[in-house]
A protein has these predicted regions:
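Short, flexible loop segments at the rims of nucleotide/cofactor-binding pockets, characterized by
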Residues: 3-5, 10, 46-49, 94-95
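Asp-based phosphoryl-transfer active-site loop
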Residues: 22-39, 130, 163
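Mg2+-dependent phosphoryl-transfer enzymes with acidic/Ser/Thr/Gly-rich catalytic loops
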Residues: 48-49, 85-87, 91-92, 100-185
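A positional/architectural concept
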Residues: 34-64
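Non-catalytic pre-domain segments flanking phosphatase-related domains
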Residues: 1-28, 176-185
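Short secondary-structure boundary segments
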Residues: 30, 74-75, 96, 140-143
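Substrate-recognition element of Asp-dependent hydrolases with the DxDx(T/V) motif
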Residues: 59-83, 93-94
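Feature captures the catalytic cores and cofactor-binding loops of soluble hydro-lyases/lyases
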Residues: 78, 97-102
Length: 185
């Protein structure tokens, strides 16, 4: 059995740590990953979601380190567009029933191979992309099948800093955790 590597959040397998070191593109789902998965609906049809500022800080830190960040979500929402724009994420794919096609498009645009990509998901719709990437991440409260199949399961719940945890893992694996700081937003 290999010796685990201690990260800020939990011990990880050396192989997972090495995979994280080679990530050039992190793709995230939104509902259940960036948000807690709850959708608040008002009487007039308005929709509200919450996003954790820690996740924003982590994303900005990755971008400052030259690591691309993209979003693929099954739903369509102006809230998501505005939040991702505020974070500096330009590759935002919404309303995607076929997340694999969106993933291929992102990789083609950026000319990044699957061995340099990671994906954070929480439900079965995310698996087709997750099985293609090197760093397969499921949030702590994700679907049990994804938890079983992921090579990293966050300690943190979706919408409560899970994205930040993965950003920190990637930066720590590169010895750049304290070098690239984002702005909390």
């Amino acid at each position: 059995m290999s010796t685990m590597i201690q990260t800020l959040y939990k011990p990880v397998e050396p192989n997972t740590f090495n995979i994280a070191k080679d990530i050039k593109l992190l793709i995230c789902d939104v509902d259940g990953v960036f948000s807690d998965g709850l959708i608040y609906m008002g009487n007039n049809g308005e929709e509200l979601k919450t996003f954790h500022t820690r996740d924003g800080y982590g994303v900005k830190s990755l971008l400052n380190a030259g690591i691309e960040v993209a979003v693929i979500t099954g739903r369509q929402s102006n809230i998501v567009e505005n939040r991702m724009h505020a974070l500096g994420i330009s590759l935002v794919y919404q309303g995607q029933d076929d997340k694999l096609q969106a993933y291929q498009d992102i990789c083609d645009k950026l000319k990044i191979s699957p061995k340099h990509t990671g994906y954070i998901g929480d439900d079965l719709i995310d698996w087709p992309v997750m099985e293609k990437v090197a760093l397969k991440v499921c949030v702590a409260d994700g679907h049990p099948l994804l938890v079983q199949r992921a090579n990293y399961v966050t300690k943190t719940l979706g919408g409560h800093g899970a994205v930040r945890e993965v950003c920190d893992l990637i930066l720590q694996s590169r010895n750049e955790l304290e070098v690239h700081q984002g702005l909390s937003i």
